[in-house]
Amino acid sequence: MVYLTLQKSQKVFAASRHLHKVAAKALEKSTPEETVTGSFASFIHNVRPDHLSDLVRHRSKRMILDSIGVGLVGSMTHVFDIALRYCQEIYSSSSSSPVSSVYGRRGLKLSPPLAAFVNGVAVHSMDFDDTWHPATHPSGAILPALLAASQMVPAASRPKGLDFLLAFNVGIEVQGRLMRFSSEAHNIPKRFHPPSVVGTMGSAAATAKLLSLNATQCGHALAIAASLAGAPMANAATLAKPLHIGNATRLGLEAALLAARGMEANLLILDDTPGCAGFNAFYDDYQPSPLTLSTNSHEFLLEKQDIAFKSFPAHLGMHWVVEAALSARNLLIDHSGSLSPSAIHTIILRVPLSKYINRPFPESEHEARHSFQFNACTALLDGKMSICSFSPDSLCRQELSQLLSKVMVEHPKDNVANFDKMYAEVTLILQNGDILTGRCDSFYGHWRKPLSRESLLRKFQTNASRVLPKDNIDNLVKTVDNLETLPDCSLLASCL
């Protein structure tokens, strides 16, 4: 038995030695900076605040403010309570220092990884967080990690607000670059939830930058994060989906902390190495390229591709169908002089084909947030959408059930499941045979029709006011607006 075990160990060692030789040969052909992974690590380590343009600073601060507001209102949800109780009860005897703030719980502190986890859950608890193209939720996977990490650094050496803003943009940039290595990633996902993959990598990159890891440690942080990434789309529209963001931000933070303590991993993790599955394990058409940084300037992806902010808490695709439904509703009122659901014979939705957001009769708030049918019919019935639209009382209305029973869904070939190209049409066929159609190509809040400063502030203030007094809300707005001048970035987390 001992002999057989020794034989197995020798085989494992030989196989491991072979893999190390393959990796070594690949590295021999180029310096670390010339590999894709090495270029990313070098970028994370070397990028400076003066590489941030005024536009990138402006857009990223809007993202930070919106994400904080979404996290604060998310701290009132059932799924957040479950996650918080879990961390408090299961890890109550943890030796980790409880130094990091929690959304909506003034005075409560958790260890940095646990604070990042519960705050990430809060951000995605209602699917109210921002969305980018290619499709992912970029801010929620990064901001909680940075807030938690900022409070764990000794007071005498804490990064400044400008360092925090740079680290945030590093995390956004890494996510965007990775998703652009695959055309598959541009469309509404089918297999795995993107922020659970690229968000984990972005969190690791952002935390590594904030904590000033060296280039090699940055590479190891990315490689470690890749081993902690992934979540299946089958858990969309369930209580488990917010865990995807919570885990992404926590595990990315932990990957950076492990790298800082000497943990090593494959420094070719982002390269397309023949015979070795690295980050290409997540995308069938993965074609990476180096992330270069010039001495004087760098064009961040956020400069070219703005973000989408949601006006109500639901999957981004719902925002097209709601605006189309509201347009059809107005046509019906103009046509008939009033809104009478009984006057509607059939409702036709022309939307992209995506199974997990095609839910004819949702039975929970999380299913409702991922239902074209529910959102279209609720908008027709109420003339608006809000947090209250997904309450149990709203879901159980008789008149809503009657409208849902009249819905037919069509998937035009030209309507692709892509947040940059999709559209929505809502056609009402009336009992008298008249036909009314509302259409939306770009909803208000989409990157082609960005929210105004006033609309973004109104959303933030409405969300934050559920848990914070007005003075605290005003202070948060000022702190984010003046983030570059903040002498200690942990002051932002202390405002929560």
Where is each model-derived feature located?
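Terminal-appendage/accessory-domain detector
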Residues: 2-6, 13-136, 233, 240-250, ...
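Generic alpha-helix initiation/capping and coil-helix boundary signal
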Residues: 7-8, 16, 53, 160, ...
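Hydrophobic face of alpha-helices
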Residues: 57, 61, 65, 142, ...
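Well-ordered alpha-helical scaffold segments within catalytic/enzyme domains
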Residues: 74, 146-155, 204-210, 255-258, ...
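Function-dense linear segments that define catalytic or interfacial modules
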Residues: 114-166, 170-174, 178
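Short amphipathic alpha-helical face segments that pack within enzyme cores
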Residues: 140-148, 198, 202-206, 319-324, ...
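Glycine-rich, mobile lid/loop segments that gate access to catalytic sites or pores
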Residues: 151-254, 273
